Amino acid sequence: MIVLGIDPGSRKTGYGVIAETAAGYRVLGCGLVRPRAADTLHERISQLCAGLDEVIEQLKPEAVALETAFVGRNVRSALILGQVRGAVLATVMRHSLPVREYAPREIKLSVTGTGSACKEQVAAMLSRMLELGGELKPLDVTDALGIAYCDLARGASSLGGQLRKNGKGRSKGWAAFVNEHPELMA
């Protein structure tokens, strides 16, 4: 299964594509779609959609995962993000891809074992688990990778989910994972 995680934003949108194979997870591609900052919101949204079209056509995901919308105190920012999310969803739906959404806490929990982890902790854990090497990725990119990882780890579209449905491959919990994989810990 190949999942595209998207962290939408009007100035830059992070994306991460992860494939789940019998050998584990492998990053197929990740990066930022950056519209021209001087352009209007409508022009930036159009550029964002074109960039996501390219990512989808090149990396061929089978599903898309997004973080659920967070609404803070700034109404204007929430409205802009709503427009961006709508455009992202329309772009994805044009490619007939299923979409799943996850709460930020659920994403952090699936990556780090705690729902209160900061973005830097999520990035560090993903760097180890997905073998991203020493290269630091922008937080928008690691957020997108975390969203895709969460989808696969939760079994929404994964081999692991199929095993759980068959009653095999039950999780032994976070502590057992840490004990079995000390090389992934700092």
Curated annotation (Swiss-Prot):
SUPFAM superfamilies: Ribonuclease H-like. Gene3D superfamilies: Ribonuclease H-like superfamily/Ribonuclease H. The active site is at D7, E67, D140. CDD domains: RuvC. Its main location: cytoplasm. Homodimer which binds Holliday junction (HJ) DNA. The HJ becomes 2-fold symmetrical on binding to RuvC with unstacked arms; it has a different conformation from HJ DNA in complex with RuvA. In the full resolvosome a probable DNA-RuvA(4)-RuvB(12)-RuvC(2) complex forms which resolves the HJ. The RuvA-RuvB-RuvC complex processes Holliday junction (HJ) DNA during genetic recombination and DNA repair. Endonuclease that resolves HJ intermediates. Cleaves cruciform DNA by making single-stranded nicks across the HJ at symmetrical positions within the homologous arms, yielding a 5'-phosphate and a 3'-hydroxyl group; requires a central core of homology in the junction. The consensus cleavage sequence is 5'-(A/T)TT(C/G)-3'. Cleavage occurs on the 3'-side of the TT dinucleotide at the point of strand exchange. This is Crossover junction endodeoxyribonuclease RuvC. It comes from Chlorobaculum tepidum (strain ATCC 49652 / DSM 12025 / NBRC 103806 / TLS) (Chlorobium tepidum).
